[in-house]
UniProtKB/Swiss-Prot annotation:
Homopentamer. Contains a large N-terminal NADP-binding domain, and a smaller C-terminal substrate-binding domain. It is an enzyme of class 5 (isomerase). GO terms for biological process: ADP-L-glycero-beta-D-manno-heptose biosynthetic process; lipopolysaccharide core region biosynthetic process. NCBIfam families: heptose_epim, PRK11150.1. Belongs to the NAD(P)-dependent epimerase/dehydratase family. HldD subfamily. It catalyses: ADP-D-glycero-beta-D-manno-heptose = ADP-L-glycero-beta-D-manno-heptose. Substrate binds at residues 169, 180, 187, 201-204, 209, 272. This is ADP-L-glycero-D-manno-heptose-6-epimerase. The lineage of its organism: Bacteria, Pseudomonadati, Pseudomonadota, Gammaproteobacteria, Enterobacterales.
Length: 310
């Protein structure tokens, strides 16, 4: 069995899909379906069982067994960069991750987990997986950073695989439940389909992010499980492309619309990553050599998926 926490969420459900594509269906999905809309991410997927996150954590802390577990993909977390309840964030993202990590170490179960490019904070260059480059801007980034630091202490002594992925700006299918945290491509598509003008912040041609397609993210996760490499790795494309490029690809697919530029909100000033670009040196050195989709390629594929029933 393979366990996927956050398996009804965005990246988790895409990992479940990638496993299904390889013929793997003996999957336990762990999630919190209080937001009932997330079930749609699993409707077309095949899993063996579902468990609520709280029940799962109780069983993990009690040391209960789940049968022959081949790996745990730990994608479950509070991923809101605008959430400032630090206790909630640390309980959800840090303590929970530590409990799972030790459960896996004791049983030598491969543990693959979601870190984040938010660990780098507001820097504009040298996105390198090393302490001197890390300075998170929000409590979400701090919770991810602190767990990475914890993992670094344990890695040299670990007898089983531990791998963390610093996800950059992930976009693609199965993110509709994320609301304001969904990607720009998702929001632009929704606005166009509602007959509204698609909106970007003023200066969006200057805001550049490393936008990585979720299908590529899932492929990297599965490659690492198959190859047993440990460490903390950036997971982006290695390219910085503008929000304007995302909009251009969206409009090109729809063949209509004109961007409306809106003022940049005061509440985000100083807490907003204006530039991200993954340094893929360590990922490539680990042996992962597949190309990553460009924004034009990924957004076009995503638009086709979003509008498949149109």
């Amino acid at each position: 069995m393979i366990i996927v926490t956050g398996g009804a969420g965005f990246i988790g459900s895409n990992i479940v899909k990638a496993l299904n594509d390889k013929g793997i269906t003996d999957i336990l999905v762990v999630d919190n379906l209080k937001d009932g809309t997330k079930f749609v991410n699993l409707v077309d997927l095949d899993i063996a069982d579902y468990m609520d996150k709280e029940d799962f954590l109780i069983q993990i802390m009690a040391g209960e067994e789940f049968g022959d577990v081949e790996a745990i993909f730990h994608e479950g977390a509070c991923s809101s960069t605008t959430e400032w309840d630090g206790k909630y964030m640390m309980d959800n993202n840090y303590q929970y991750s530590k409990e799972l990590l030790h459960y896996c170490l004791e049983r030598e179960i491969p543990f693959l987990y979601a870190s984040s490019a938010a660990t780098y904070g507001g820097r504009t260059s040298d996105f390198i997986e090393s302490r001197e480059y890390e300075k998170p801007l929000n409590v979400y980034g701090y919770s991810k950073f602190l767990f990475d630091e914890y993992v670094r202490q344990i890695l040299p002594e670990a007898n089983s695989q531990i791998v963390g992925f610093r996800y950059f700006n992930v976009y693609g299918p199965r993110e509709g439940h994320k609301g304001s945290m969904a990607s720009v491509a998702f929001h632009l598509n929704t606005q166009l389909n509602n007959g509204e003008s698609p909106k970007l912040f003023e200066g969006s041609e200057n805001f550049k992010r490393d936008f990585v397609y979720v299908g590529d993210v899932a492929d990297v996760n599965l490659w690492f499980l198959e190859n047993g490499v440990s460490g903390i790795f950036n997971l982006g494309t290695g390219r910085a492309e503008s929000f304007q490029a995302v909009a251009d690809a969206t409009l090109a697919y729809h063949k209509k619309g004109q961007i409306e530029y809106i003022p940049f909100p005061d509440k985000l000033k100083g807490r907003y990553q204006a530039f991200t670009q993954a340094d893929l040196t360590n990922l490539r050195a680990a042996g992962y050599d597949k190309p990553f989709k460009t924004v034009a390629e990924g957004v076009t594929e995503y638009m086709a998926w979003l509008n498949r029933d149109a």
